A protein has these predicted regions:
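Active-site beta-strand termini and strand-to-loop segments that position acidic
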Residues: 2-4
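Conserved beta-strand in the GNAT
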Residues: 8-23, 55
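Acyl-donor binding region in acyl/amide transferases
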Residues: 23-162, 168-176
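A short beta-strand motif that forms the metal-chelation/ATP-contact edge
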Residues: 178-180
Length: 180
């Protein structure tokens, strides 16, 4: 794994997991954050112009290594990267499997209700992509079933205290993307 900005690389051993990370200063030189193709980050970045942001993007872990130990090592590496570069805020997208909004209405509603971003931290999906997440009242959501079926990564982000922005996006392929 290599940090193009710092010119560092991991030597030797087997690479079994990785995350796509991009610092704000690097993103500015290369057309912005990936998330900006689906979410309006400009107001957030302007409100917090004194802070340094890191986008946490796609993760990939080799088959046979997917589990808590490798996830913890990846997050330890991310935390070391955050400290090394003196970063303040992490942002990014996470995906739900599938593109059938009706079938995902419980999950979308749960996320919208359980961890909404306060106004100063909120981001909104771009209008031409935006799907309303508040599909039903929380009283109609089977929370136990949702928690069982949410992707592990989204559950981990919730445990870490993430905020959920306003709106979801049907991504390219077979997922609905949610900004966290």
């Amino acid at each position: 794994a290599k940090d193009e900005g710092a010119g560092t690389a991991v030597q030797g051993g087997n690479l079994v997991g990785t995350y796509r990370l991009i610092r704000q200063d690097v993103a500015k030189k290369h057309g912005g954050f990936y998330s900006e193709s689906e979410f309006d980050l400009a107001p957030l970045l302007q409100r917090h112009s004194h802070l340094k942001f890191l986008e946490v993007g796609r993760s990939c872990v080799a088959q046979g290594f997917r589990g808590k130990p490798v996830a913890e090592l990846l997050w330890q590496g991310i935390w070391n990267y955050v400290r090394y570069h003196k970063l303040d805020v992490m942002l990014g997208c996470a995906s739900l499997e599938g593109v059938d909004v009706a079938a995902l209405s419980d999950q979308l509603s749960f996320l919208a209700h359980v961890s909404p971003a306060p106004a100063e931290w909120n981001v909104t999906a771009l209008e031409n992509h935006k799907i309303d997440m508040q599909r039903k009242p929380m009283s109609e959501v089977n929370q136990k079933a949702v928690l069982k079926n949410l992707p592990t990564l989204i559950k981990a982000y919730l445990r870490l205290g993430c905020y959920i922005g306003d709106g979801a996006v049907i991504g390219s392929g077979s997922t609905i993307t949610k900004d966290v």
